[in-house]
A protein has these predicted regions:
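C-terminal cap/substrate-recognition subdomain and adjoining C-terminal extension
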Residues: 2-21, 97, 104-248
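Active-site neighborhood of HAD-like aspartate-dependent phosphohydrolases
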Residues: 13-69
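Conserved active-site and cofactor/substrate-binding residues in soluble primary-metabolism enzymes
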Residues: 36, 90, 177
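Acidic/polar active-site rim loop that often engages polyanionic ligands
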Residues: 38-41, 61, 78-80, 161-167
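Active-site phosphate-binding/coordination module
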Residues: 48, 92, 155
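Small-residue-rich anion-binding loops in enzyme active sites
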Residues: 68-79
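Metal-dependent phosphoesterase signature
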Residues: 77-113
Length: 248
């Protein structure tokens, strides 16, 4: 008997893997804006009677130290914790109104135009641009939205029934946690970290900076300046330009 012919199965087309896109990750405090976004958040909270005058002056002193001495892990952690605790017991809607006010009254006046231009250049060249900040997620979201950036990765505050508990969800987005956060984002959004850029002023962000193919130091502290020079990274110091402009 003749052999029964077998109908060849149609081969399924091989699904081509989409090429990975690049992104640019920007720290916020002293990189996108001068000073601490959490302090500016606290200032607006004080103006809305969220906390006492005593707490306000503690914030003011912390801001002074931050601007002139740079980040300090212990001081920064204390500042972030205090800022987050201010929202305990308040409605989520109140926080949303507050962060809009923070941007309009304070943050937009303290933006570094040069860094904002860098971020917008990345957008124009087809890259995603993400803010990576220890400030509350809601504040990061507002800054990203107002600047027409892709989005923000920030510290998340727990919500229950429309009320803020003042407790963190996960860890503050600071130091090594920033590296973990951008790696998770890259995996979820099919981004190539090797093709990506990262910008920061602080040596505390070295874990994030060294996770990408194109790290850039912006208004760097002393430790980051030394590291960036040794590694031959681009360095932008907009503080010196501002001081020179003020003298002219």
């Amino acid at each position: 008997m003749p052999a029964t012919s077998k109908v060849a199965k149609t081969a399924k087309p091989v699904k081509k893997e989409q090429p990975k896109k690049a992104a640019a990750f920007f720290d916020v405090d002293n990189t996108i804006l001068r000073g601490s976004s959490s302090f500016l958040f606290g200032k607006s909270a004080f103006e809305r009677n969220f906390f006492s005058r005593k707490d306000f002056w503690r914030f003011a002193w912390a801001q002074f130290r931050f601007i002139w001495k740079g980040e300090n892990n212990n001081k920064l952690a204390s500042l972030k914790d205090r800022a987050l605790s201010l929202v305990e017991g308040h409605r989520v809607r109140d926080l949303e109104i507050l962060v809009d006010e923070v941007y309009d009254k304070h943050i937009k006046l303290k933006l570094w135009p040069e860094t904002v231009r860098l971020a917008k250049d990345h957008i124009a060249e087809g890259r995603e641009v993400w803010l990576v900040t220890a400030a509350p997620q809601e504040l990061g979201d507002v800054i990203a939205k107002r600047l027409n950036l892709t989005g923000a990765i920030g510290t998340k505050v727990e919500r229950k029934n429309g009320i803020l508990t003042g407790k963190l969800v996960g860890k503050p987005i600071h130091g090594p946690t920033k590296r973990v956060a951008i790696k998770d984002l890259a995996k979820n959004r099919n981004l190539s970290l090797k093709k990506s850029y990262a910008y920061s002023d602080s040596h505390n962000d070295l874990p994030m900076l060294t996770a990408v193919g194109h790290p850039v130091a912006v208004n760097p502290d002393k430790i980051l300046t030394r590291y960036a020079k040794a590694a031959d990274w681009p360095i932008y110091d907009f503080k010196k330009r501002e001081l020179k402009a003020n003298r002219d």
